């Protein structure tokens, strides 16, 4: 109750004050207009000065970057896409009108532009008006050469930086297909990023459907849903202008310009003055004042007592090892060793390789007629051809279905609050207004309150190890430590300075004199007095002996003690260096004459000498000769070809020339084969390897020259290139009685500015022209006629292809060999000796081949299938035995090994091809560990010595290991010893770069020539490896 009564006073005062404030406000509202003007004359003026701000000016510059390279300008019909761009851009800018956007910003538009190929031309500088820009746009002409998009972007950025001032919103519309032929200016990504740093917003628009989407995305700003969004100049499957692209880009431009220029400002209207406030309550007690100045410095303290002697220090660490002693004296010469035991017999050597042919023997007498032979086995399966190169991109597919409707736009900001108006009467429902413009994106909302706890989630997988955290904050101060031991007595301190004299206090008021009081009680003891030193007293009596003092510190080192007894014998030292050889002794007495030695090897015959010469020099091989022949290849190096297809053209030239035999060593001689090459693009870029080039005097030098040709990536001037080839190569260096062939490769139409009459520039009675057209366009009548014109109207000399990869097909290379060299001469040297085989083939001796396949996880499922096909191809290639006890021909077996207890015999030693192929189809991949030692032991025990007959008695036993050598070493030495006992001839096929050569050398019994290294399992099917492998095992 007391508290309530205490609060009634202040609450009553506040309540009364509030009522007075309301009355004062009502009184202010009741004042007449004249009085109001007299009371506050500045209110209306303030309102007039704080109306809505003026509409902001927003100048916008739009820059167009147009691609007129060959890949765009040469689309059928020529320059059709350029003409389309010249219609698209004016229609685009015609819809960019100066206006008040959303009644808040005043948009005004200016324009600029350039077009590019492998060079850049600015046709309209930034800031141009619509009329001058449109006039300049209609006057551009395409370059039809390479595509350097990065240089165009760099030039565009420089133009805008130089000609456009601050406060201008910059947009760029880049119309290109996204393909590039070079990046001499740093690349698209770098130049597009520099443009964005300058505040330029880039839109990427495709002129056709043959586009590189990734290149367009590299150009466009983020997000791509705004600046790329499948923009195109023409509608799908039509030549009409895509109006939807124009509308969407303009909508984004206006919205972005509005967001850049519009500045939100609050509407400020001053209100009337409020009522006078009430007197505040008495303030609370103030905080404690600042501490006073320090007092006078105290006197020096008494010296402390001397502390105890410290504890002994830790034991010292052992000293460093002494230096090595001097070399000892030379030891005595050792006694001669005992005689060694007899060595064990060496292992049986592997069969030798096929030797060179021996001397031809005398003709033998005719033998008896043989028995009629049985029907022959099916023929061998042909080699699998090499995988062709990837084809050109397919034609554009049908247009996709319309996309889903876009999401609703963001709601705009609320407008500024208006001034309160006069309350009107209730009106009727008005007509429905038009749909408003989409508002700009709203400001971020306030942070929401914490939501309710969700259900407990499942325990997540352990995440990856996070980065090292930042250094922790400095920890709080620790607790006060225990009191330390007394320190040693310190030196006497200096005398302190006298303190400053304090100020005198104010005198107090004199009070009335009081009566004498009663004696008070006894006071408290006074505070201790100051311990000033008194005068020295008289000496006291001698005291009693004190307690024993603390233990003293460690004393100084004593004198050196007497020497100790002799130590134990040390470890033996390293042997000293060998002594210098002594002087040469006197010459001994000649020994008795020895016994005759064993007969020597027979001397080398003439055939043996010739064999060594052929093996060492390789100069006795047969060679192919095509007679006096000149071949000129004319290859297309324009942008439309592409780098990959240009490489295929060069490979085609090299592969064909490989089939023509040796090249003339002297290009000026009247005989032999000479080869020239012309690569062409636009005018002035032709490059040639001439027929009479003295540097091209061998096949290897010609290959090197072809490989050094670089892709020009420009326009296509085919007629001028044919004229250049005839005048500069054929006409200038023609030889008498020499056949001349020309092979022309092109991908289609040439630049219309070139002269069509030059298509027949090679049509000479002594020149045979083969025209190779690659692409679908040659099915058209006009382009087919151009190809026939190049081939001098000879249809049999025209070759049509769909893909460039068909150039390097083996069948087509054979066809070109027959065209260029129809009647070759095979010239072999006359040898005095013929040869025969040292070792018979697999058809003339028994061979049992056991394949041991590493089925570990390093092999992989896909490579396992490739190995199965390899074993199957070997079974088809070899001549297999007719029965298990056949004394000739081969049998095969396959064992897949994994861990120590995982060995799988796919099929034992057999001659039946059907059994081999069915077993290979059933074989499964172990996907286990690798223990080659247990695999070898299992093969010997279960395949070589198997219950089903095992290896033949007099057959050569061959083990073929398919492994990388990364395996367990358990029982490896034992298994290698077992191979030696069984006279196994090993062969190792190691695939990949990660191999264990130590293990491979052991299982090959030390014969490194028996180890075949290949880069991948696809190489097992290549003829270069497969034929070599078959010759080795046979």
Swiss-Prot record:
<feature type="short sequence motif" description="Cell attachment site">
    <location>
        <begin position="381"/>
        <end position="383"/>
    </location>
</feature>
<dbReference type="GO" id="GO:0009411">
    <property type="term" value="P:response to UV"/>
</dbReference>
<feature type="signal peptide">
    <location>
        <begin position="1"/>
        <end position="25"/>
    </location>
</feature>
<feature type="modified residue" description="Phosphoserine">
    <location>
        <position position="720"/>
    </location>
</feature>
<dbReference type="GO" id="GO:0031012">
    <property type="term" value="C:extracellular matrix"/>
</dbReference>
<dbReference type="GO" id="GO:0005615">
    <property type="term" value="C:extracellular space"/>
</dbReference>
<keyword id="KW-0379">Hydroxylation</keyword>
<dbReference type="GO" id="GO:0042383">
    <property type="term" value="C:sarcolemma"/>
</dbReference>
<feature type="glycosylation site" description="N-linked (GlcNAc...) asparagine">
    <location>
        <position position="342"/>
    </location>
</feature>
<keyword id="KW-0325">Glycoprotein</keyword>
<feature type="region of interest" description="Disordered">
    <location>
        <begin position="272"/>
        <end position="603"/>
    </location>
</feature>
<dbReference type="InterPro" id="IPR036465">
    <property type="entry name" value="vWFA_dom_sf"/>
</dbReference>
<dbReference type="InterPro" id="IPR052229">
    <property type="entry name" value="Collagen-VI/PIF"/>
</dbReference>
<feature type="modified residue" description="Phosphothreonine">
    <location>
        <position position="716"/>
    </location>
</feature>
<dbReference type="InterPro" id="IPR008160">
    <property type="entry name" value="Collagen"/>
</dbReference>
<comment type="subunit">
    <text>Trimers composed of three different chains: alpha-1(VI), alpha-2(VI), and alpha-3(VI) or alpha-4(VI) or alpha-5(VI) or alpha-6(VI). Interacts with CSPG4.</text>
</comment>
<feature type="compositionally biased region" description="Gly residues">
    <location>
        <begin position="445"/>
        <end position="454"/>
    </location>
</feature>
<comment type="function">
    <text>Collagen VI acts as a cell-binding protein.</text>
</comment>
<feature type="glycosylation site" description="N-linked (GlcNAc...) asparagine">
    <location>
        <position position="912"/>
    </location>
</feature>
<feature type="compositionally biased region" description="Basic and acidic residues">
    <location>
        <begin position="380"/>
        <end position="392"/>
    </location>
</feature>
<dbReference type="GO" id="GO:0043491">
    <property type="term" value="P:phosphatidylinositol 3-kinase/protein kinase B signal transduction"/>
</dbReference>
<dbReference type="GO" id="GO:0005576">
    <property type="term" value="C:extracellular region"/>
</dbReference>
<dbReference type="GO" id="GO:0032991">
    <property type="term" value="C:protein-containing complex"/>
</dbReference>
<dbReference type="Pfam" id="PF01391">
    <property type="entry name" value="Collagen"/>
</dbReference>
<feature type="compositionally biased region" description="Basic and acidic residues">
    <location>
        <begin position="321"/>
        <end position="333"/>
    </location>
</feature>
<keyword id="KW-0677">Repeat</keyword>
<keyword id="KW-0597">Phosphoprotein</keyword>
<dbReference type="GO" id="GO:0009749">
    <property type="term" value="P:response to glucose"/>
</dbReference>
<feature type="short sequence motif" description="Cell attachment site">
    <location>
        <begin position="441"/>
        <end position="443"/>
    </location>
</feature>
<feature type="compositionally biased region" description="Pro residues">
    <location>
        <begin position="574"/>
        <end position="584"/>
    </location>
</feature>
<feature type="short sequence motif" description="Cell attachment site">
    <location>
        <begin position="504"/>
        <end position="506"/>
    </location>
</feature>
<dbReference type="GO" id="GO:0062023">
    <property type="term" value="C:collagen-containing extracellular matrix"/>
</dbReference>
<feature type="compositionally biased region" description="Gly residues">
    <location>
        <begin position="421"/>
        <end position="430"/>
    </location>
</feature>
<feature type="short sequence motif" description="Cell attachment site">
    <location>
        <begin position="554"/>
        <end position="556"/>
    </location>
</feature>
<dbReference type="GO" id="GO:0007155">
    <property type="term" value="P:cell adhesion"/>
</dbReference>
<feature type="compositionally biased region" description="Low complexity">
    <location>
        <begin position="302"/>
        <end position="320"/>
    </location>
</feature>
<feature type="region of interest" description="Nonhelical region">
    <location>
        <begin position="26"/>
        <end position="270"/>
    </location>
</feature>
<dbReference type="Pfam" id="PF00092">
    <property type="entry name" value="VWA"/>
</dbReference>
<keyword id="KW-0272">Extracellular matrix</keyword>
<feature type="glycosylation site" description="N-linked (GlcNAc...) asparagine">
    <location>
        <position position="155"/>
    </location>
</feature>
<feature type="domain" description="VWFA 1">
    <location>
        <begin position="61"/>
        <end position="249"/>
    </location>
</feature>
<keyword id="KW-0472">Membrane</keyword>
